[in-house]
Amino acid sequence: MLTLGLESSCDETSCSLVQNGKILANKIASQDIHASYGGVIPELASRAHLQTFPELLTAATQSAGVSLEDIELISVANTPGLIGALSIGVNFAKGLASGLKRPLIGVNHVEAHLYAACMEAPATQFPALGLAISGAHTSLFLMPDATTFLLIGKTRDDAIGETFDKVARFLGLPYPGGQKLEELAREGDADAFAFSPARVSGYDFSFSGLKTAVLYALKGNNSSAKAPFPEVSETQKRNIAASFQKAVFMTIAQKLPDIVKAFSCESLIVGGGVANNSYFRRLLNQICSLPIYFPSSQLCSDNAAMIAGLGERLFCNRTHVSKEVIPCARYQWESACS
């Protein structure tokens, strides 16, 4: 089956063609326009998706060596995300599905991040613990199989990627700051600052306290939002970045062994943009004795290959297929703890 995937949940526009699980083309267009604002502007994101989808679709079909008529299924990210951005993708998908007379399936963007690792590791062991870490999400799932996601825990405040971006801004790094902070941290001393990992009861996370701790480290007692940041040496910036990175990832890592035991998981699946962090990958390999599955770098960021892959799998299994595909900004998962 040849599946077209479409992704527009935030600020990446992507078109991909996947055939029976094999990626034939995966085109991604990032929106640099948001950098000057220090964050994603929803209206600008929607406009960019609208302008970019047609040319990106042409590029994907040409790269894969197929025509629109060869497409057998259209899979689109319809939840969760920015409602305007999602609507652009869903409407574009509906137009194609109607014109080509092809079936259309909606796919959960967060679930697709975890499925991305399964696309590249067909022999993934289940039940698995799924960890989705991105700019907007930090969630743990019990995965009895590759297409079932039961919520175990989530962040109570900021997502981990959002926290990275905010701390990067404190350090004077441009948006998006996650990767730039990681690069800065490589040259720093992770033990220079005693940022304690946040401890939250149960299986949830909290990152707002770490963000505040970094603010105090930079501003001292004068940590109000209006107070200017003092001059900080490059060495101190590197040390703060390294210490923050260690603490923020330990916030997650310290919970995993108990959760794996509680839910009898046989593997760990990690997905999302933050899953590309090399420090976190090394940390997980040190503390986890289970097999760990990460997507390749190109499948960590928002992309349509994961949307096409999961959509194809769901359609072939005839599971979770809705006749009506509706964009939805938020999604409520069934709990694994009930």
From Swiss-Prot:
Binding residues annotated for Fe cation, in chain numbering: H109, H113, D302
Residues given in the record as substrate binding sites: A132, I133, S134, G135, A136, D165, G178, N277
Known function: Required for the formation of a threonylcarbamoyl group on adenosine at position 37 (t(6)A37) in tRNAs that read codons beginning with adenine. Is involved in the transfer of the threonylcarbamoyl moiety of threonylcarbamoyl-AMP (TC-AMP) to the N6 group of A37, together with TsaE and TsaB. TsaD likely plays a direct catalytic role in this reaction.
Domain of life per record: Bacteria
GO function term, MF aspect, one: iron ion binding
Assigned keywords, A-Z: Acyltransferase, Cytoplasm, Iron, Metal-binding, Transferase, tRNA processing
Similarity comment text for this entry: Belongs to the KAE1 / TsaD family.
NCBIfam families found in the cross-reference section: gcp_kae1, T6A_TsaD_YgjD
Entry keyword Cytoplasm: yes
Coiled coil: none
Main location: cytoplasm
EC number(s) recorded for this UniProt protein: 2.3.1.234
Enzyme class, spelled out: transferase
Organism: Chlamydia trachomatis serovar L2 (strain ATCC VR-902B / DSM 19102 / 434/Bu)
Name of the protein: tRNA N6-adenosine threonylcarbamoyltransferase
Entry's localization field: Cytoplasm
Catalytic reaction annotation: L-threonylcarbamoyladenylate + adenosine(37) in tRNA = N(6)-L-threonylcarbamoyladenosine(37) in tRNA + AMP + H(+)
Residue ranges crossing the lipid bilayer per the database entry: none
Cofactor(s) this protein cannot do without: Fe(2+)
GO biological process, one term: tRNA threonylcarbamoyladenosine modification
